[in-house]
Amino acid sequence: MGSRNSSSAGSGSGDPSEGLPRRGAGLRRSEEEEEEDEDVDLAQVLAYLLRRGQVRLVQGGGAANLQFIQALLDSEEENDRAWDGRLGDRYNPPVDATPDTRELEFNEIKTQVELATGQLGLRRAAQKHSFPRMLHQRERGLCHRGSFSLGEQSRVISHFLPNDLGFTDSYSQKAFCGIYSKDGQIFMSACQDQTIRLYDCRYGRFRKFKSIKARDVGWSVLDVAFTPDGNHFLYSSWSDYIHICNIYGEGDTHTALDLRPDERRFAVFSIAVSSDGREVLGGANDGCLYVFDREQNRRTLQIESHEDDVNAVAFADISSQILFSGGDDAICKVWDRRTMREDDPKPVGALAGHQDGITFIDSKGDARYLISNSKDQTIKLWDIRRFSSREGMEASRQAATQQNWDYRWQQVPKKAWRKLKLPGDSSLMTYRGHGVLHTLIRCRFSPIHSTGQQFIYSGCSTGKVVVYDLLSGHIVKKLTNHKACVRDVSWHPFEEKIVSSSWDGNLRLWQYRQAEYFQDDMPESEECASAPAPVPQSSTPFSSPQ
């Protein structure tokens, strides 16, 4: 059978993270590198695994060693969140002061972004016009048709990026996922407590209106997605099934989509839904891509896609014909749904340049550009018209295989801080300044309607939301308030609001608040420049959750 009405199965034994240790990891390194990178007490790691049920002690070691392990178990049993976040909190991701933008200078994405933000054709100095000057030009009738164009509106909004905490909701366990619906009317949050919470975001509200207990959950809900019609949502976990559930109505109807995997321990780390809602795409820990057809009510494809865990999947655009996938082999692959066959699983191309596993992929929505987040502590921007050569793919595979650290509980090795470009790296741009530790941290393009997609934003293992300028590569905003890693981030499709979901158990909504006037925002006349700044005004507060 393809689907069933599933029953609650509890949390299960689960795993302490999304992925098992990488296959092929552990090649020899120099003694100097090992001394630099070794900063984890192996006994503490073992205690953590024992506490989570991932390993068992069978025999040997002596009573003294067992007593020592038990002491660690007892001392840290009530402090899991501190363990999960402490390495990320100590890590200070290096910021790239001089990003290499040479590949972007002659690529069409530069023109696209400048056109979408009203900067195309302007001299560099004019692109930095202050907001008051733009208003002055509009009043003089110098704007097109007497009003701001959509691009100029996006440029105006860039002056008002979220900078203040407007709302917080707290959970008893880690928040794993949090996304806005396509129309921005609903926000969905998934927590390790097996509960999926839905928030009403209409008319400036952010109010919880429904809580749903997830089914067949092992460890945690790992990914969520809305159906295109906005009436249902899907979620995945350490389970053979992807579940779909209704948003509206009195009761909760959970339908389990059976993927029929070959692995005994199976997890779907990433899911996506086609634009017509018919096909569900999943990336799993067995290195395979799965396609489930909801009309046929069965799994229609199981493609051997990567040499290791598939951590990220995405559709390239609204046609849902081109797919992206990324895994722990550090390769991003591009697939054509019309030519995918189980007996001949060949992608149409591959994108190589990362030095460690890929944690997330987001498409720009135009079937051409995408970004990928990676355990090598970088985000890369790709153009699928520039596939990588065999040399580039081999360089990425070799770099990933030679990694001898585990991002879930070890510090980032110092060699990963180096600004190194692999041979054959076909990426357009590399963004540095955020941390990727503990979990599959997400990154995304900013919305097209409000920002012209001129920004890239990401969660961070240090508890921040990091916003990059897409064209310059520089960090334009850091939102800091969480006490553990931020796993997921979501920007409202039409408003200047960002929601962060963190392992500290908090959901935070960030919005713009005028705190003070800055020099470049003041009119240039001496009379206005000397006028006192008004008293700061707080924006309208949000309603408390029910």
Curated annotation (Swiss-Prot):
Locations of Low complexity compositional bias?
Answer: 1-19
According to the UniProt entry, the coiled-coil residues are: none
Q: Where is this region: Disordered?
A: 1-40, 523-546
Q: Where are the WD repeats?
A: 170-210, 216-258, 263-302, 305-345, 353-392, 435-480, 481-520
Q: Give the highest taxon in the source lineage.
A: Eukaryota
Pathway in which this enzyme or protein is active: Protein modification; protein ubiquitination
Task: Show the GO cellular component annotation of the record.
Answer: Cul4-RING E3 ubiquitin ligase complex; nucleoplasm
Q: Which UniProt keywords apply?
A: Phosphoprotein, Repeat, Ubl conjugation pathway, WD repeat
Repeat listed as a keyword: yes
Q: Where is the composition biased (Polar residues)?
A: 536-546
Q: Which InterPro entries match?
A: DCAF (IPR051859), DCAF11/LEC14B (IPR017399), G-protein_beta_WD-40_rep (IPR020472), WD40/YVTN_repeat-like_dom_sf (IPR015943), WD40_repeat_dom_sf (IPR036322), WD40_rpt (IPR001680)
Q: Which residues cross the membrane?
A: none
At which residues is Phosphoserine found? 75
A Pfam family cross-referenced in the UniProt record is WD40
The entry describes its oligomerization and partners as: Interacts with DDB1 and CUL4A.
Q: What is this protein called?
A: DDB1- and CUL4-associated factor 11
The species this protein was found in? Homo sapiens (Human)
Source lineage:
Eukaryota, Metazoa, Chordata, Craniata, Vertebrata
